Amino acid sequence: MTRRIICQKLGKEADALNYSPYPGELGERIYNHISEQAWQAWLSHQTMLINEYRLSLIDPKARQFLEQEMINFLFGIGSEKPAGYTSEKE
């Protein structure tokens, strides 16, 4: 049976993640409070940020930026799209 949680991002009951997707205390917080659906939304948003800002994941500043954006997206005020960004669907 799938574990269910009240997702902090979605504000409703949803399927939980099967494993902690991030190391440390933050990963534990994500595992306990963020749904699979919200995590997938973050992964899509993260991909857009990496591409639009041309981030290199070997750069510690880029990783720090993405971690802060992840916290904002999942738990806080949200993460803004880059200025001038338009999706292919628009």
Swiss-Prot record:
Keywords: Iron. InterPro entries: Fe_traffick_prot_YggX, Fe_traffick_prot_YggX_sf. GO terms for biological process: cellular response to oxidative stress. SUPFAM superfamilies: YggX-like. Transmembrane segments: none annotated. One of its GO terms (molecular function) is iron ion binding. It holds the Pfam family Iron_traffic. GO terms for cellular component: cytosol. Could be a mediator in iron transactions between iron acquisition and iron-requiring processes, such as synthesis and/or repair of Fe-S clusters in biosynthetic enzymes. Belongs to the Fe(2+)-trafficking protein family. NCBIfam families: PRK05408.1. This is Probable Fe(2+)-trafficking protein.
